[in-house]
Amino acid sequence: MAATAQPDLVVRPLLRKDLDKALDVWVSAWQTAYPSIDFEKRRDWAAEHIADLEQDGALPSVAVRDSAIVGLLVVDPNTGYLDQIVVATACQGQGVANALLAHAQHLCPNGLDLHVNQDNARAIRFYQKHGFVVTGPDVNARSGAPVHKMSWRP
C-alpha cells in the first residue's frame, strides 16, 4: 500500500536492500537535529531497533523520490506507536515528513502516539501542526532525556 504526497514521492515498505540508505537518512537527520551527538556510532543500534520493532509488528516504510530514499517511517499499526519519522537533511521542508505522517495515519486510522524530545522544537511544531497534542511528560529510557508524550486522534 503506497501513499503519495506529490507525483514524484512514493512511500512504500522498507526492503532489506534499502536498509543502508535508510540508515544514512536516519544518521543525517538526527545529526542535523543534535550536532553534538555522533549518530554514526548509533547506526548499528538503529538497525537492531528497527528490526526488533518490525519483528514485534511495526511496519518500516521509506519515502522515495527519483529512486533515492529521502525519508524513513517506523510505525506499529497494532499499537499506533510512531517510533520514527526522519527525513534526509537536503529534503527537509519539502513535504516528505507530511507524506510519511499521512502514511502512518493511514496505517493507524484510530490514532497515533509518540515520544518526542522536549528540546526538539521543530518536531514538536510539526506534530502540533498535524493535530498532535502533548499528553504528558516522560523520560527517554535509553538517553535519560526529557520527552513529551504526544497523541493524535482523528
Predicted features by range, described:
Residues 93-106, 125, 129:
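Conserved acetyl-CoA-binding loop-helix of GNAT-fold acetyltransferases
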Residues 1-17, 152:
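Conserved N-terminal entry element of GNAT/NAT acetyltransferase domains
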Residues 97, 101, 119-123, 140-146:
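Short glycine/proline-centered loop/turn elements that form peptide/ligand docking sites
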Residues 58, 145-150:
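Short hydrophobic/aromatic beta-strand or adjacent loop that forms the aromatic wall/cage
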Residues 128-137:
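Conserved acetyl-CoA-binding loop of GNAT-fold acetyltransferases
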Residues 88-94, 118-119:
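Active-site acidic-Proline motif in GNAT/NAT acetyltransferases
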Residues 107-119:
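Conserved GNAT acetyl-CoA-binding A-motif
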Residues 13-90, 101-103, 107, 140:
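Acetyl-CoA-dependent GNAT
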